[in-house]
């Protein structure tokens, strides 16, 4: 059973902007409306399941569904109805090999559909992402540690080469722990069994195909939408038990860019680039 749980660690690594150790997660994120931008809300549901082949080898299966809502109070000089509701659907298929008590190797393939789906599913909606990871963990010693090294390719990032995934975790005191790396850093205070407080710095973002290209000023066409943010935040987590919890996060975007892109992924229109408050809340069944 312990090996089965360990395989779940980072089985949802979908791209260089996403890490998750969750079996189930239900999450809501919002960036409220400002004078220079519309409000954005995102709902996510994911589920993952490892299938045991033998004591050392597992198949990983999973799926994620996300809905992105833009408020319908248009502030732009073009018809932006195509952007009101966007959807992302991921399927995960992976393989995990437990080399020994400390080392585990994982490979993950993630087909993705990301679009407004105005005209059903089109080939431009499809992307194929993959990740490979090496995980070294020593969670039984007095000061537990975990190191994750890997590469992840995501067509939506616009880079033609895999991007690095680096994460190091250490619980250096019964009440204190930290995690440093890309794409997330955290510093946690564990108050008794049920309450955890944290400060976090994280990356977030996505790319979605826009069917029915949007006609823009200067005769440009918007064929896709990308959002990337760097967020500094404080959070609270209520732990029902070791693996089940409710959580919330509140902060501010330190960097934020929303862009319309043409068929070659070149930026053709800036939707917003100023900072905004950032709220996230959810429920998860995880490993740690």
Q: What is the meaning of each model-derived region?
A:
Residues 24-26, 61-63, 107-109, 147-149, ...:
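Membrane-embedded beta-strand positions of outer-membrane beta-barrel proteins
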Residues 166-169, 273-288:
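Outer-membrane beta-barrel "beta-signal"
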């Amino acid at each position: 059973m312990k090996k089965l749980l360990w395989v779940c660690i980072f089985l949802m690594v979908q791209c260089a902007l996403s890490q998750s150790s969750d079996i189930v997660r239900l999450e809501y994120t919002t960036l409220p409306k400002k004078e220079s931008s519309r409000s954005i809300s995102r709902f996510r549901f994911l589920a993952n399941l490892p299938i045991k082949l033998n004591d050392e080898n597992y198949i990983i299966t999973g799926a994620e569904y996300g809905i992105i809502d833009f408020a319908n109070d248009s502030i732009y000089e073009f018809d932006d109805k195509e952007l009101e509701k966007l959807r992302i659907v991921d399927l995960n298929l992976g393989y995990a090999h437990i080399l020994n008590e400390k080392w585990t190797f994982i490979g993950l393939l993630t087909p993705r559909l990301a679009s407004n789906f105005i005209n059903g599913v089109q080939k431009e909606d499809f992307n194929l992402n993959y990740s490979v990871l090496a995980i070294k963990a020593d969670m039984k010693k007095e000061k537990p540690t975990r190191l994750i090294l890997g590469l992840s390719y995501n067509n939506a990032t616009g880079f033609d080469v895999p991007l690095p995934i680096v994460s190091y975790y250490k619980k250096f005191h019964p009440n204190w722990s930290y995690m440093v790396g890309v794409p997330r850093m955290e510093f946690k205070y564990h108050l008794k069994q049920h309450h955890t407080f944290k400060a976090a710095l994280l990356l977030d973002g996505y790319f979605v195909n826009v069917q029915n290209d949007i006609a823009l000023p200067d005769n440009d066409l918007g064929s896709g939408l990308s959002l990337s943010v760097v967020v500094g935040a404080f959070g609270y987590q209520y732990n029902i038990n070791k693996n089940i919890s409710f959580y919330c996060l509140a902060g501010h975007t330190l960097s934020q860019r929303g862009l319309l892109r043409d068929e070659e992924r070149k930026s053709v229109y800036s939707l917003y680039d100023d900072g905004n408050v950032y709220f996230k809340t959810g429920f998860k069944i995880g490993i740690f």
